[in-house]
Amino acid sequence: MRIVFVRHGEPDYSKDSLTEKGWREAELLAKRISKWKVEEFYCSPLGRAKDTASCTLKAMGREAVILPWIREFSYHIDDPVTKRHSIPWDFVPSYWTKESLMYDIDGWTQADVMKQNPIIESAYKDVCQNFDKLLASYGYIRENNFYRMPGKKERFVAGTVSKDGSPFADHDDDSLSEPTIVIFCHLGVICVVLSHLLNIPFPLLVHGFFLPTTSLTIVSSEEHWSNEAYFRVQAIGDVHHLLNGKEPISSAGSFVKAFQG
């Protein structure tokens, strides 16, 4: 199974829509995605995500399933250092890196700054539980920190290279027909889902990775042993469609100008 997360185009937050540049990004994105075989499209209920999706959906004559729980993870806190009242990330390094709970996959919601807003803990659990329900509809059942596919043909492949050192070529042809789903959503909630899939604390992901607008984050399920699966990131923040279309990469959401190479 392949999951493609799409961050919305450059946002006009005052209108919960896109800037003119954001619409150009969305059109270039549509040209890229419309070449794919997509099992299902899913989308956040927020306007900037729906507007981004609209270009692809129109090009393909498709509709998206709206998932209320994949909205942005914008549950506000009061930053103890900068005093801003805003999203629960973008903390200064000297503050968040000394908080041991920020490195705890099960405990980061209990850090003092996160506990300011009790919705953060329940919202995180809600996203994780609903994402597991979505995966279960495709046959992936959460078991502790990985997924199992009951009834699926078992495979036993111990490595990615053969005994002679050549790349392992005997990949199951069935993998070519496995579903690809596309989810139009937001930087923060993408990091929430990746936190759950990869068992990495949310603060490490959201402070460590920048996902440009209309970027693709591609995650595939690796099913090489028995009927067990673990999700692995193939690409994160990919914007080849913008570079190929000579559209500059937006720095929206970053404290540094995005590299244009």
Task: Give residue spans per PLM region.
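Active-site metal-binding loops of divalent metal-dependent hydrolases
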Residues: 9, 187, 237-239
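Short catalytic helix/loop segments, enriched in acidic residues and glycine
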Residues: 18-33
